[in-house]
Amino acid sequence: MKCLWLLVITVLCLRCDTAGTKPRRGRGSMWWGIAKAGEPNNLSPVSPGVLFMDPAVHATLRRKQRRLARENPGVLAAVAKAQYAFAECQHQFKYRRWNCSTRNFLRGKNLFGKIVDRGCRETAFIYAITSAGVTHSLARACREASIESCTCDYSHRPRAAQNPVGGRANVRVWKWGGCSDNIGFGFRFSREFVDTGERGKTLREKMNLHNNEAGRRHVQTEMKQECKCHGMSGSCTVKTCWMRLPSFRSVGDSLKDRFDGASRVMLSKADVETPAQRNEAAPHRVPRKDRYRFQLRPHNPDHKSPGVKDLVYLESSPGFCEKNPRLGIPGTHGRACNDTSIGVDGCDLMCCGRGYKTNTMFVVERCNCTFHWCCEVKCKLCRTEKVVHTCL
């Protein structure tokens, strides 16, 4: 009997060791499924004031995210608009070997395939652009009164002129007014919603938190002041000014530049120390605010430490030349390329040295369009010849 118990304990220990060394899979964020599928609203159209959530969408959210949706009616529609982040990702990488392809699954963590299991540059961009998308859409939704729990940003106060008109002091030539996009709400809610599940205990979780924060920072710091003049005969005696979000295309351009200059990182020595080395009790859970208090250092000691708006990654990217079903990589076979370019969209790089084929095709397009009063645009149909190069 004693031998039997020893055998059982040995087997259990072996299983525990195996489970401990097995890498975590499916690191992608489940909420991505909302943005992909599109949730029109979380208010019931039948009973006003009653919250409604599609069961399929309900399954993509964690408990905290469902609570945030209940407490802030209208946010799911704003989160769904983060689908622009997917379109922007595909726009930025349409001429690259990895073109940010997504899968038609509702379960969000599978949208980009299992490449998100890898701590590479592409994963860093995915996390940053989706976090930025939520921040951007929420800030705008507040201005449009689409969310019950937030409004325009009225934190700006009127300012007196620095150069008084006509020598009179305190003559206001411009003032804050209008309706500013509520970047404060968008930033805070994105932190609460997007970062749910990222406890900041492992290096990979710290990477995700850093890149999520970088995406939000790009939206926040690129806010622009817009003004409208008021006065007699076109004069600008008074200007009403407000803060406006940048276009999401400009956010995508900035993050793409950060992608090209992303930093490979590791934990700093202070973060590597165990609680026992610091004579502290090991916490059961990292406090919410403390999970952002970490320092990543460059993998190459000759490089500078990454800033708050830089993208960071942990490992080299996989190859994108050949199809890899396990990682969801489609490969570059059949991709269009530019035979005159020496850049990443050129046939030499895009086709990974396999060569390419050239086809001539005829397409029918609208041309010679003219405007006729009122109000019609008439076009002719032209048959044009196009030369298309595709990778072998």
UniProtKB/Swiss-Prot annotation:
Glycans are attached at residues 99, 338, 368. Disulfide bonds join 89-100, 142-150, 152-179, 227-241, 229-236, 321-352, 337-347, 351-391, 367-382, 369-379, 374-375. One of its GO terms (biological process) is neuron differentiation. It is found in: Secreted, Extracellular space, Extracellular matrix; Secreted. The keyword Metal-binding does not apply. Ligand for members of the frizzled family of seven transmembrane receptors. Probable developmental protein. This is Protein Wnt-1.
